[in-house]
A protein has these predicted regions:
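Short, small/polar-rich motifs associated with maturation and membrane association
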Residues: 1-379, 392-394
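Transmembrane beta-barrel architecture of outer-membrane proteins
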Residues: 153, 179, 235, 334-338, ...
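Outer-membrane beta-barrel transmembrane domain signature of Gram-negative proteins
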Residues: 168, 319-342, 429-438, 513, ...
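Residues on the lipid-exposed face of transmembrane beta-strands in outer-membrane beta-barrel proteins
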Residues: 186, 242, 339-345, 381-385, ...
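Short loop/turn motifs that connect adjacent beta-strands in outer-membrane beta-barrel proteins
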Residues: 245-251, 346-347, 390, 472, ...
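Transmembrane beta-barrel strands of outer-membrane/channel proteins
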Residues: 253-261, 354-356, 395-401, 497-503, ...
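Flexible loop and strand-edge segments within Gram-negative outer membrane beta-barrel domains
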Residues: 264-266, 315-355, 359-366, 370-456, ...
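A surface-exposed, glycine/aromatic-enriched loop/edge motif typical of exported proteins
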Residues: 265-303, 400-450, 505-550
Length: 656
């Protein structure tokens, strides 16, 4: 019993010692708690890096909902709950900051521009507007999203990346010839439904721009967003801004090199020779029940059995089993290189880029890589100079060269041939004992089979014996812009004028082998072999090696040698487009009220050497108002005219 009393006494002493030890800690914590509970009023002025006060900067105490906004003179006042609090400062277009109070009551803040915040500012209808105050329907992405798709054409890279944008590819898909058609919110007319493309404020094609020269993409979808463009904006507008230098940015050199592989996702899965022959017989008997099962127009069961056991190249004498897609197509190599320099000082900013893109072809058996590839060269130089405190000069220069190389046979023709040729028909005859044209076939490395009127073309012939074409397009684009602040008249007022000139020409070299016609049928211009008329293609079904043993062939298309290539060189009519813009902008904040407006005159004159000049002219206006970024009002109007319409009906008013 005494033992239990001793244990109880020890436990009591232990508890008292623990309590005595804990007390000093609680007492020491009291001053800290008292310090954190004391409030502190902090004030100051917020300016940009040029020393101008910033209006509407948001200041929030980290970890709380307590915040404030800077006034028209950049001043702010905020109460923090304790002296060691942290202030989070943010403003559209500037890098966010976190500032420790450290028991200070006066904190002046300088905001630094940040390109990462540009996504919060959107280019809309010849103007720039905060994303949060836009009433129209828009979508925006940056270059980072586009670089995930290494394609020769920017249009294709937009697929699935912007809501409301439909991307459809209707071209053949050859290197460079794969530009997708863009529609915003579907196709709205049976007529021309192309969207308007605006590059740095100028209506230009963006298809073959390099992703490395692009800053942002914005699409304008509804009437309020597209009204400044008039009736041409009915199908939507895509606005592209290219990269520019930033103020105070140290020179930065970027080099990019990427290599990739391009190939079709999948090919059609067709029947082999055995399956084709089985269903062919079934179809023939269904069409003509009285047909003798032993007819020469049908495949024999022995032939079908041989097809099932055959290797496919007839090296075992059991017949052919061609996969035309596997024979004709292969993966291709993509190469993309770019070098750019970007930087700026307090007075001048610049961005310069050069890039090279090479997309190899997907055709096998082409006689030269030059027959099937696409090349693109891009150059861009954007320079901004602050001539005076109020006058800004911008000079933009863009150049682009594209080179398309493709065989005389079109992609549609080659794919159609792969889709329709029976798998049991050979493409090349490995041996031929007929002296007629023998030397020509030996020189060309194989004997091309020509069957009958149903199968007039040969896959190998289409790939490497139809000649080639080379189309080179050259683009040169330049613009000169002056902008001037009119703050001496009233704060927030500015005026700008811009002139641009674009020129384009095309040079084509065509070395294709012509086709020729007999009656209603068209035949290739290259020489091929054909079974003699007394031994038709139907009879050949069950005698796959007859032509090897007998060697009784005649030329199929009345050509003992390939036709000569028809060499021709053509120069497309050069195009020149000049544009002039003059605009007046106003943006100012009065306390909680934000007011902005824009008035623009636009003139475009397009000249093609052998056509009548075409002119487009218009006025556009925009007015916006918001109260505390909560209550928004926006009015847009376009008054546009086009020479596409008859006199008296050329102009229209388009409000929204």
């Amino acid at each position: 019993m005494n033992k239990y009393h001793i244990i109880t006494l020890i436990l009591c002493l232990f508890c008292l010692g623990g309590a005595a030890t804990a007390s000093p800690d609680r007492t020491a914590a009291a001053p800290d708690t008292q310090a954190r509970s004391s409030q502190l009023k902090v004030s100051g002025i917020i300016k940009d890096d040029a020393g101008s006060p910033l209006i509407g900067v948001t200041i929030v105490v980290k970890g709380t909902s307590s915040g404030s906004v800077s006034n028209s003179d950049g001043s702010y006042t905020i109460t923090v709950p304790y002296a060691e609090a942290t202030l989070m400062v943010s403003y559209i277009g500037y890098a966010p900051q976190e500032i420790n109070v450290n028991n200070r009551t006066r904190i002046d803040i300088t905001m630094v521009e940040d390109s990462k915040a540009l996504e919060e500012v959107v280019v809309v209808g010849y103007n720039v507007q905060k994303k949060e105050t836009i009433t129209g329907s828009i979508s925006t992405i940056t270059t980072k999203d586009l670089k995930q798709s290494p394609t020769a054409n920017i249009n294709n890279a937009l697929a699935g990346r912007m809501p409301g944008l439909l991307v459809n590819q209707f071209n053949g898909g050859e290197p460079g010839n794969d530009a997708a058609q863009l529609n915003i919110r579907g196709k709205s007319t049976y007529g021309k439904s192309d969207v308007i493309m605006i590059v740095d404020g100028i209506e230009r094609d963006m298809s073959y721009l390099s992703p490395d020269e692009i800053e942002t993409f914005t699409i304008l979808k509804d009437a309020s967003a597209t009204a400044p463009y008039g009736i041409r904006g009915a199908n939507g507008v895509i606005i592209v801004t290219t990269k520019r230098g930033r103020k105070g940015e140290k020179p930065t050199v970027d080099f990019k090199a990427s290599v990739g592989v391009s190939e079709p996702i999948r090919y059609p899965d067709y029947l082999g020779s055995a399956g084709y022959a089985t269903l062919y017989n079934e179809a023939m008997l269904n069409d003509n029940p009285s047909l003798d099962p032993g007819s020469a127009s049908l495949f024999s069961q022995e032939t079908i059995s041989n097809f099932r056991r055959a290797k496919g190249d007839n090296s075992d004498g059991l017949g052919y089993n061609w996969d035309y897609f596997d024979y004709a197509f292969k993966p291709s190599i993509l190469q993309d290189y770019s070098l750019s320099v970007r930087g700026g000082t307090d007075r001048a900013r610049y961005f310069i880029l050069g890039s090279y893109y090479n997309q190899g072809g997907n055709y096998k058996h082409s006689n030269s890589d030059n027959v099937n590839k696409f090349l693109r060269y891009n150059f861009r130089a954007n320079v901004d100079v602050d001539a005076t405190k109020r006058l800004k000069i911008s000079v933009d220069l863009g150049a682009r060269v594209t080179e398309f190389n493709y065989p005389g046979a079109t992609a549609a023709n080659i794919i159609s041939l792969a889709n329709t040729q029976p798998p049991y028909l050979p493409i090349i005859l490995p041996n031929n004992h007929n002296d007629v044209n023998q030397a020509d076939f030996e020189e060309n490395g194989g004997y091309l089979l020509y069957a009958d009127n149903d199968y007039r073309y040969n896959m190998l012939g289409q790939l490497n014996r139809t000649g080639f074409s080379k189309r080179t397009r050259r683009y040169l684009q330049g613009s000169f812009k002056l902008s001037h602040d009119l703050d001496f008249i009233t704060k927030g007022l500015s005026v700008a004028a811009q002139f641009s000139y674009d020129t384009y020409n095309q040079h084509t070299i065509n070395n294709s082998v012509p086709t020729h016609s007999t009656g209603n049928l068209t035949y290739p211009g290259y020489s091929t072999w054909m079974l003699p008329t007394e031994y038709s293609i139907d009879e050949w079904k069950n005698n796959a090696d007859y032509w090897i043993k007998n060697g009784t062939y005649v030329t199929a298309n009345q050509r003992t040698t390939d036709d000569a290539q028809s060499n021709s060189i053509s120069h497309g009519s050069p195009e020149g487009t000049s544009r002039f813009q003059a605009r007046l902008d106003y943006a100012r904040k009065f306390g909680d009220h934000n007011v902005s407006g824009m008035l623009l005159f636009y003139l475009q004159n397009k000249v093609i050497s052998n056509q009548v000049p075409f002119r487009y002219m218009g006025f556009s206006g925009r007015a916006t108002y918001d109260y505390r970024n909560k209550y928004l009002f926006e009015f847009n109007i376009g008054y546009n005219g086009s020479e596409n319409f008859a006199r008296g009906k050329r102009y229209g008013v388009f409000p929204a």
